[in-house]
């Protein structure tokens, strides 16, 4: 991609039209002009009185390198010869009030390591990618009908060196990727990697949207990390925050002394909960900045998806007591998704949205927002409230576990067990579970069993896979020493077996977004807090029966209605001794009794373990999908909710 001489750009292309390559105009680009090598600096500051480029190269002297205003709408530019890569710089902006303020470059692709705040000249081009095979394989699959298991992580606290320092992007490739491959995750989702000044914002309060944070290395180092992920078949999703940004003095806030990237109206500009300000999504230059940024990460870093943060905050004006929709945000999100999918139709655009806004994952031409996935925040909140309740009282909130199936097919959902629920005093997943030490592990195994068998793609925050006891501590790494304890090793083994079972079992993901993929067997047994259901694949013989017991009681010879196959095998039981359970399992082949039960043609009698999940698979006859009498087996469906895509 070539740098565009801003003097040749029609002003309408950036100021009034859709222009999604603005990173080719703005920022610091190493170029040769009039046979001299140097750097061209270009910036948009519509209300600046004067502009200069300052840095070590001119001893930060505002008078030496004055910029030229090349459009009436406030594009400023300057070519400075003999400046090389890794030079640090800022823009010195004289405001209309006569003050001079120093700002980092909004389009800089590299920055100093915090606490320093200057931008750094860096040639983003030149990395040689080796992921063509990944791209080809990705295009051959439909993400909607594939298994998806996402490992959410915070780069700075997954693991640290013995001296407490951070692993670099390249070192994380060596440490993290084998771990992710071992656990058979299909994707990793990384909390924001844009440049940000404050570690404890976790990257959600950014200053440099085009700069991969220098905490972990250079942009090329991050490209290497993504390249290695693709080499081993792992997709990379980034958290991306197009709704709001931080108010640090060197960043976008009041960039030229006036609201430039943010709304002018104080009532909607400020975001008091987070101490940030909201992007003015009705301004064409801001839209071009953000959509260009999304495409920049796709094109230069080969990212496979974005989890778009805080969509609810964008969809509604944040005036106190007001729930009026923000039409600027609605049209921006539609424009964003159209641009992204025009670039890559296989991309993952996931909305983190806690509202009931309709058609979030419907195409824009059907009136939707155009995402292809949405976090199911309602499922997460309901299920965790249910699990935190004492088992003997769960029967009174039985609907917490069934309600999600009333809307499971209204959107394309990802089920998140995310970082939001294991921080700020909310406890870890393991420690949310009531009861004694054994009870906690048994119920977490049960939760994971329900999680992997419920319709929807899967996301788990780091540490959950081995039962992190403490909630997430963002300044420390995970408690890897817990592997010294038997129950945590059991938990880890169980999780790896569960995810492997999920990936090889088509009924658990093939019809995730179709109501034909799920059928309740018994959703109404609140007295015993037992749930049973069927997951169905494309083929009628691809069916699994799932039974979940959310109390500590054990049940012998418990009747469960099943589709009319002759035999069933238990393929997973969370109470197996090898997972730390009590060993109440169904070892023998289960013969289906040809008597209707639970609105099914037959039933089996099984042992239901305490706090246990049991997964049963029908045993196929020699003729595959046919029973011994020659008739085809059918799974009844009583679900009428509509599916999408």
From Swiss-Prot:
- What is the catalytic activity of this protein? Transfers a segment of a (1->4)-alpha-D-glucan chain to a primary hydroxy group in a similar glucan chain
Q: Which UniProt keywords apply?
A: Carbohydrate metabolism, Glycogen biosynthesis, Glycogen metabolism, Glycosyltransferase, Transferase
Name the Pfam families for this protein. Answer: Alpha-amylase, Alpha-amylase_C, CBM_48
Whether Flavoprotein counts among this entry's keywords is no
Instruction: Check the record and name the Gene3D superfamilies matching this protein.
Output: Glycosidases (3.20.20.80), Golgi alpha-mannosidase II (2.60.40.1180), Immunoglobulins (2.60.40.10)
Function summary: Catalyzes the formation of the alpha-1,6-glucosidic linkages in glycogen by scission of a 1,4-alpha-linked oligosaccharide from growing alpha-1,4-glucan chains and the subsequent attachment of the oligosaccharide to the alpha-1,6 position.
Query: What quaternary structure, including any partners, is listed in this protein's UniProt entry?
Result: Monomer.
Name it.
1,4-alpha-glucan branching enzyme GlgB
Origin organism is Bacillus cereus (strain Q1)
């Amino acid at each position: 991609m070539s740098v565009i001489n801003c003097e040749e750009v029609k002003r309408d292309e950036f100021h009034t039209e859709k222009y999604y390559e603005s990173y080719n105009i703005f920022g610091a680009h190493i170029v040769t002009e009039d046979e001299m090598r140097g750097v061209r600096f270009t910036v948009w500051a519509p209300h600046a009185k004067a502009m200069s480029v300052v840095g070590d190269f001119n001893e930060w002297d505002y008078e030496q390198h004055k910029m030229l205003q090349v459009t009436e709408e406030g594009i400023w530019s300057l070519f400075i010869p003999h400046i090389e890569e890794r030079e640090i710089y800022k823009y010195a902006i004289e405001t209309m009030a006569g003050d001079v303020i120093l700002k980092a470059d909004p389009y800089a692709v590299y920055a100093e390591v915090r606490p320093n705040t200057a931008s750094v000249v860096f040639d983003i081009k030149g990395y040689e990618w080796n992921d063509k095979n990944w791209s080809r394989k990705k295009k051959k699959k439909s993400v909607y009908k594939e298994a998806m298991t996402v490992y959410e992580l915070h780069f700075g606290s997954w693991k640290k060196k013995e001296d407490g320092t951070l692993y670099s992007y390249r070192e994380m490739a060596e440490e993290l990727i084998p771990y992710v491959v071992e656990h058979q995750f299909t994707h990793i989702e990384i909390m924001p990697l844009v440049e940000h000044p404050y570690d404890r914002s976790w990257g959600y309060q950014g200053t440099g949207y085009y700069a991969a944070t220098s905490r972990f290395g250079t942009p090329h180092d991050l490209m290497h990390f993504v390249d290695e992920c693709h080499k081993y078949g792992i997709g990379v999703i980034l958290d991306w925050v197009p709704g709001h940004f931080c108010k640090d003095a060197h960043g976008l806030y009041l960039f030229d002394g006036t609201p430039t990237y943010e709304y002018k109206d104080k009532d909607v500009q400020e975001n008091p909960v987070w101490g940030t300000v909201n992007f003015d999504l009705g301004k064409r230059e801001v839209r071009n900045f953000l959509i260009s940024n999304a495409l920049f990460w796709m094109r230069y870093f080969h990212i496979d998806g974005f989890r778009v943060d805080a969509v609810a905050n964008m969809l509604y004006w944040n005036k106190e007591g007001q729930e009026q929709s923000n039409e600027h945000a609605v049209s921006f999100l539609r424009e964003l998704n159209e641009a992204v999918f025009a670039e890559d139709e296989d991309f993952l655009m996931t909305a983190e949205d806690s509202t009931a806004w309709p058609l979030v994952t419907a195409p824009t031409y059907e009136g939707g927002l155009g995402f292809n996935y949405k976090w199911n925040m309602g499922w997460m909140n309901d299920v965790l409230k249910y699990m935190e309740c004492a088992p003997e009282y769960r029967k009174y909130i039985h609907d917490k576990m069934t309600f999600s199936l009333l809307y499971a097919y209204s959107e394309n959902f990802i089920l998140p067990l995310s970082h939001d629920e294991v921080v700020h005093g909310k406890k870890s997943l393991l420690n949310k579970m009531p009861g004694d030490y054994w009870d906690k592990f048994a119920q977490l195994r049960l939760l994971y069993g329900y999680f992997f068998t419920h319709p929807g793609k899967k996301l788990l925050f780091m540490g959950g896979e081995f039962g992190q006891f403490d909630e997430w501590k963002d300044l420390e790494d995970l408690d890897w020493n817990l592997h010294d304890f038997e129950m945590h090793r059991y938990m880890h083994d169980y999780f790896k077996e569960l995810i492997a079972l999920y990936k090889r079992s088509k009924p658990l993901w093939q019809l995730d977004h179709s109501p034909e993929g799920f059928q309740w067997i018994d959703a109404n047994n609140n007295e015993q807090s037992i749930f049973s259901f069927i997951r169905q694949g494309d083929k009628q013989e691809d069916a699994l029966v799932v039974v979940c017991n959310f109390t500590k009681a054990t049940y012998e010879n418990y009747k469960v209605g099943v589709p009319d196959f002759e035999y069933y095998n238990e393929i997973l039981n969370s109470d197996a001794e090898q997972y730390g359970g009590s060993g109440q399992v169904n070892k023998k082949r289960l013969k289906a009794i040809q008597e209707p039960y639970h609105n099914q043609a037959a039933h089996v009698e099984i042992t239901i373990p305490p706090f246990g999940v049991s997964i049963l698979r029908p045993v196929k006859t020699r003729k595959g999908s046919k029973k011994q009498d020659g008739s085809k087996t059918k799974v009844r469906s009583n679900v009428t909710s509509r599916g999408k895509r």
